[in-house]
Amino acid sequence: MASSREIRNKIKSIKNTQKITRAMEMVAASKMRKAQDRMKKARPYGEKIRNVAAHMSKASVEYRHPFLIDRNSVKRVGIIVVTSDKGLCGGLNTNVLRRALNEIRVWGAEGEQIEVCCIGNKGLGFMSRLGVRVISQVTGLGDAPNMEKLIGAVKVVLDAYTDDHFDRVYIFYNRFVNTMKQIPVMEQLLPLTDEHMRDDGNEAKPARAPWDYIYEPEAKPVIDDIMIRYIEALVYQAVAENMASEQSARMVAMKAASDNAGNLIDELTLIYNKSRQAAITKELSEIVGGAAAV
């Protein structure tokens, strides 16, 4: 059995650790609320630009954007993997990376070549160790998604698809459900599907004539810009959801760590009291035995 001094030192060390985890829990709770607000505020813009993109895709008969054209055969796949820059958030990154790894193995078995864009340091490190070719990366986003930092890496993927280097593009991230639940998901980013191009504003309305736009000087540059902005909005929303998931998972992980530290302190305190009691009993026995011998 450890000495009383060793047990006291362990209790002191665990209490110091508990103070740190409680502080991190409170910080994560504050950041989680802000991340959830950013995630909710990003949704109206995403919905609106989706409706505009849907209108234009149905209205323009003289030009069809490459993002809307399905490829018959799939030989190259580009993926965007969204993870956090930091750890201490439970199994959040592990779950989404495991999901991506499973799909990479399936595509590899089918003879498809994989290239990846990494958003977040954890995903970048994992893909580098895995040996997958990383064509673009974004790290150091901080606590808020920054579109200016994301645009460059996303543009590399979009240009590769436009140049027929990719036949499919997917994105992996953690979808925020609630504080206690985050789900790793895979979504097809390109080509855009009917689900992407649905117009929520017209779902419950009677059929009417197709949308009619007059483009000056021509349709192509306008539609090109709208489609790129729509994809950027989808990526931004995924990053915002992943950040909200990250802070929620970190808060839950730190709370669990604080609770476990408390339980360990209680156990060590009980052991310390037993050890102290045994030492006192032994000392009294020695005194009584000495007195009896005299």
UniProtKB/Swiss-Prot annotation:
What organism does this protein naturally occur in? Nitrosomonas eutropha (strain DSM 101675 / C91 / Nm57)
Query: NCBIfam families recorded for this chain?
Result: ATPsyn_F1gamma, PRK05621.1-1
The entry's family comment says: Belongs to the ATPase gamma chain family.
InterPro entries named in the record: ATP_synth_F1_ATPase_gsu, ATP_synth_F1_gsu, ATP_synth_F1_gsu_CS
Localization per Swiss-Prot or TrEMBL: Cell inner membrane
Task: Look up and give the membrane topology term.
Answer: Peripheral membrane protein
Q: Which CDD domains match?
A: F1-ATPase_gamma (cd12151)
Biological-process GO terms, alphabetical = proton motive force-driven plasma membrane ATP synthesis
Name the UniProt key words of this record, in alphabetical order. Answer: ATP synthesis, Cell inner membrane, Cell membrane, CF(1), Hydrogen ion transport, Ion transport, Membrane, Transport
**Function of the molecule:** Produces ATP from ADP in the presence of a proton gradient across the membrane. The gamma chain is believed to be important in regulating ATPase activity and the flow of protons through the CF(0) complex.
Name the Gene Ontology molecular function terms of this record. Answer: ATP binding; proton-transporting ATP synthase activity, rotational mechanism
Q: What is this protein called?
A: ATP synthase gamma chain
Subunit comment: F-type ATPases have 2 components, CF(1) - the catalytic core - and CF(0) - the membrane proton channel. CF(1) has five subunits: alpha(3), beta(3), gamma(1), delta(1), epsilon(1). CF(0) has three main subunits: a, b and c.
Which Gene Ontology terms of cellular component type are present?
A: plasma membrane; proton-transporting ATP synthase complex
